Amino acid sequence: MAITKTNFIDYTRCRRYSALENIRKDKLDSKMTIEEYMKENEKEEYRELLESMFESTDDKDADLTKKEDKELSAMMKYYKEVELESAFKSKRLFNGKFVYSENTYNQESFDFVHNGIRYLCYVDIYNENDDEINIIEVKSTTSRNYIEGLKYGENSKEKNDMFILEDGIYKLKKPVNGSDKLIKKFNEKYKKLFDRYSDIGRYVFDLAVQRYIIENDLKSHKINKRVNYYLSVLNHNYVYDGYMVGEKRVYRTINGEDIVSFFDMNEITKEYMPIIESLVDTLENNIYNPDSSPCNVGVHCSYKEKCECKYKNICYKDLPEYNSSFNYIGFTDRIGLGPDKYNKYDLINNGYYKLDDIPIEWLQNKPNMLIERECYDNDKIYLDKEKIIAMFDTLEYPIYHLDFESFPCPMPRFKGERPYTQSCFEFSLHIEHEPGICDKDKDNYVFLADTLNDERLEMVKEIVKRIDPSKGTMFAQNVTFERSRLKELAYIFPEYKDQLFKIAERSTDLLYFIKNNQSIYEELGFDEERSKLVNFYHKNLSGSYSIKKTLPVLSDLTYKNLEVKNGTEALVTYSLYDDMTPDELERAKKNLRVYCKQDTWAMVVILDALRNLVKNDK
């Protein structure tokens, strides 16, 4: 085996990780087979892709990292497209010899041995000319983090860019002769690049590890050429114009924007080297002196993230699946709990695992947390009948229960889309004509794209055909998502703009009924304090109002017997259309229809359950 870039990232999480791996020391300096590396690298790339695609999903329990090889390969083709576009741009920027390939067999590799341990990495794009070597690391994230996420200024109105576009490459620009306050603000943002567990810093850390391996390899071979390090990511400002050659999409430069953006990380990765060297010392000590005894958990665990530590179940064995100390309504690491503002890792490290492990005095001045705790301790239901009734009175019938399924493809597929646009391929609609009057089958319509081609216009036509924009209420769980999709479609198909905007404007959210919406309830005449309170709570919600949690509390309806159980499984199924046999495709479409129909029917059922609850509550 060898310590690859991915191994390095994992083995330096904490002291315990390498001990749990039970590494064989006699294999530490051996060559890793290309097959072993490819398998490991593909998993890492897939994980990165998932992080970017599903960063806004509510399907926190969906584990797509365990999909079959067929599913993994189908999704990975989008990652390979990003690599290919990055290679095209590299050839426009640099001269000399290029080495890149969709197949890791043909990629440039670097390795060296240190204290009996071999370190190894492959390079996505390698460029060499007479003067220098250029290393381009390709990531499927977008430029938004490095452009929008790193803006700084002396006040909220002043926005300076940390990276400035020069000759096709974004380059670091530190403030010169700026005020002390400006320099302080710059440094605060600059530190984010060195936070290996943040969305901004993780890819920089990845490239810094590569630099460490590459420089030691070159040093061992006495190669003294200058080496430049670049990060290539998708350009969040790029809007695809729909141009195709035959059946192939061509991502042309549009208004000066390329589909990928290059960031010069030379200075930053150089500054990282002492940090990496220190981590190497720690890693080697942990390997040669393994200690699997418990250690503190922390941000390095990446708990509940796509990149979470694979030994999470060992270190978090005492944390209950439901009603843990993490599950208090409104609890975030930024807000914290208790006098010391404990984040979730502090809670675990100090022995607070369950909901009732938290001292009740920590919940004072946190009324929703107190409601949750009271329901948990006393096995009771909390219900604000008046607020829910007032919300029902705002509804205008018919109610159009609407749910979209979308595919946030890394590479924009259709005209008007950007990288990771939530491209809709399906919707379900249940029409509730009067309170409780809605037939599961007769009052339902499902539109599903028949192919992977652009069928958005057909979808829009069905929406405006079945939803009257002049009356009724569009209803959704997390209505912001449905509103945003309707408005995006309106701009792409301006002939339907008025109708789609009117539908979006006449909308409300299931969460306003079951949870709250402070501004709406204040408009309805409730005081500020009461408007902030949740309307309903049952201990089985475990602090969450997702439809998957509320449904079993208020009905017998379940997703467990469905082939497609959540939105992420839905989009993966859709993305596999072209890889299926006719029989598989027919079954997949049936499963997608059943799942999407279940989502809107669930809203009908939950709303009716609430209606009956307030009607029967004394």
Task: List each model region and its residues.
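Flexible loop/turn segments at secondary-structure boundaries
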Residues: 17-18, 26-29, 142-145, 237-239, ...
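Charged, glycine/proline-rich intrinsically disordered loops and linkers
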Residues: 37-61, 150-195, 251-268, 521-535
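Conserved RNase H-like, two-metal-ion catalytic cores of nucleic-acid enzymes
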Residues: 83, 87-91, 135-137, 149-165, ...
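Acidic, Mg2+-coordinating catalytic module of metal-dependent nucleases/exonucleases
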Residues: 196-203, 209, 228-233, 242-250, ...
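Metal-dependent nuclease catalytic cores that hydrolyze phosphodiester bonds in DNA/RNA
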Residues: 1-135, 141-175, 324-329, 333-381
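Two-metal-ion RNase H-like nuclease active-site motif
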Residues: 103-111, 398-408, 509
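Short secondary-structure boundary/capping segments
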Residues: 26, 150-155, 244-250, 414-424, ...
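Conserved DEDDh/DEDDy metal-dependent 3′-5′ exonuclease domain
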Residues: 102-109, 122-127, 135-140, 191-194, ...
